[in-house]
Curated annotation (Swiss-Prot):
Component of the chloroplastic Clp protease core complex. The keyword Hydrolase applies. Signal peptide: none annotated. This is ATP-dependent Clp protease proteolytic subunit. Belongs to the peptidase S14 family. Its EC number is 3.4.21.92.
Length: 194
């Protein structure tokens, strides 16, 4: 997890990258721009906790461009956002799909944004079952648990009826920024200033 500015390195490009990330953190901005997995989510959770500890009165801005990924890893970020004493504003640039869309919706109400050309996609969780036949029922119940949990999370944050969420997440459900605002995933759209 990169939080502090690296002072010495043999690679000038790496030093510049670390300094840019540190500059963002100094401005209370976290960049989530990859697949949701344990490594990135551990880093994001660490950055959220670090920024809350630095100043518990200022908002944190979480910029999201993610195709989604691990549900359990994403839920660690979700739970952290929900339990911080500071407001987390979420901003979609590019794509917020699957778990990325759940994290986008998890921002504080009236502080969830998307850029005008962003795409948001929700669906039911994917499952890759690798278990003996005798354990398949356990895996199926676990998958159903996460499907129900994510649908309830989306229903809570969007104010959509649970039945509507269940219907919409049966397949990939893509939304433009405008549609995501109408749906309740975001509250505001950044319009291009041309």
């Amino acid at each position: 997890m990169t939080i502090l500015i690296q002072q010495y390195t043999n690679d000038e490009n790496k030093k510049l990258e670390l300094n840019n990330i540190s500059k963002l953190l100094q401005n209370r901005i976290i960049l989530f721009s990859q697949t949701v997995d344990d490594e990135i989510c551990n880093s994001i959770v660490g950055q959220l906790l670090y920024l809350e500890n630095e100043d518990s009165t200022k908002d944190i801005r979480l910029f999201i461009n993610s195709p989604g990924g691990s549900v359990t890893a994403g839920l660690s970020v979700y739970d952290t956002i929900q339990n911080l004493s500071v407001d987390v504003s979420t901003i979609c640039f590019g794509l917020a799909a699957s778990m990325g869309a759940v994290l986008l919706a998890a921002g504080v109400e009236n502080k969830r944004f998307a850029f005008a050309s962003s795409r948001i996609m929700i669906h039911q969780p994917l499952s890759k079952v690798e278990a003996p036949w005798s354990h398949l029922d356990i895996q199926i119940r676990n998958g159903a648990y996460f499907k129900n949990l994510l649908n309830n999370i989306l229903s809570f944050h969007t104010k959509q009826e649970l039945k509507q969420i269940e219907t919409d997440t049966e397949r990939d459900f893509f939304l433009s920024a405008t549609e995501a605002k109408q749906y309740g995933i975001i509250d505001h759209i950044f319009i291009n200033n041309n």
